[in-house]
Amino acid sequence: MALSMYHYIAREWKKPYEGLHGELMKARLLEWRRQPSILRVEKPTRLDRARALGYKAKQGVIVARVRVRKGGRRKPRPNKGRRPKRMGVYGFAPAKSLRLIAEERAQRKYPNLVVLNSYYVGEDGRYKWYEVILVDPNHPAIKNDPELNWVTTGKHKGRPFRGLTSAGKKMRGLRKSRGLKGTHKYKWKKKAKERILRKRHEASRGARLIEPDEIREKFHKGDLT
C-alpha cells in the first residue's frame, strides 16, 4: 500500500534540523524572528499535525503562530534588604509549559475564539514557536460541523486558562497518573513493568539462568549443550 503525503511530512519533522529540511527551518527562523510575537498565518506549517489535532481548511478555523521566550521566569530584583539567596530572582520556573503559555497568549489575542489545540513548529537559542488552532464558535460553518460544533456551547470559553486543552491536562498530571489510574491500560503496563523488574533482579531464577556471551565462551568453550 502506498504511503500517504502525511507520512512523509511527519518523517521530515522527526529530525527537523537536518538535511534539506534543516536549511528550510533556518530560513523560516530568520523570518519568524522579525515578525510579531503573535501572528495569524494563512496555512499551518505542519499540515499533518494540524489535521490530526482537528484543523480543517474551512471558514471559522484559523491558525496563529505564537513566539514564547525560553527559560524560567524573570522576576524584578527587590530593592529592600535581604540576602541575595532570598531575593527570589533566579531559579523560579512556572509549573506550566511554554506550549500552554502560547495557548493562553493566543486566547488573549483572540478572545472571541476557542483554542482547539496547538503544536510545536520550531525554536532557536532564545525563542520557541508554537502554532495554535482556534475556532469561531459563532460561525455558521462551525455550528453545522458535527466534529467541531461542540465548541459552540458556552462552557468551552477560555479553555487554556482552565487547563482544559491537551497541554493543560498534561500540566495537571491527568495524562501521567491521576487520570490514568484504574484503567485497564494502566494496570497492564504496571504489571508488565513489575515482571520485567522481577526478571532483572539478581536473586531471581531468570537472572541466574542468563549467562553473558563472554562467560559462555570462556568456560563452556562455545558449547551451548
From Swiss-Prot:
Keyword Ribonucleoprotein attributed: yes
A single MF term (Gene Ontology): RNA binding
Alphabetical list of PROSITE patterns matching this protein: RIBOSOMAL_L15E
Keywords: Ribonucleoprotein, Ribosomal protein
BP-aspect Gene Ontology terms: cytoplasmic translation
Any Pfam family the entry gives: Ribosomal_L15e
Record keyword Chaperone present: no
InterPro entries noted in UniProt: Rbsml_eL15_core_dom_sf, Ribosomal_eL15, Ribosomal_eL15_arc, Ribosomal_eL15_CS, Ribosomal_uL23/eL15/eS24_sf
Record-level GO cellular component terms: cytosolic large ribosomal subunit
HAMAP family in the record: Ribosomal_eL15
Record NCBIfam families: PRK04243.1
Family classification: Belongs to the eukaryotic ribosomal protein eL15 family.
Protein name as catalogued: Large ribosomal subunit protein eL15
Organism in which the protein naturally occurs: Aeropyrum pernix (strain ATCC 700893 / DSM 11879 / JCM 9820 / NBRC 100138 / K1)
Gene name tied to this protein: rpl15e
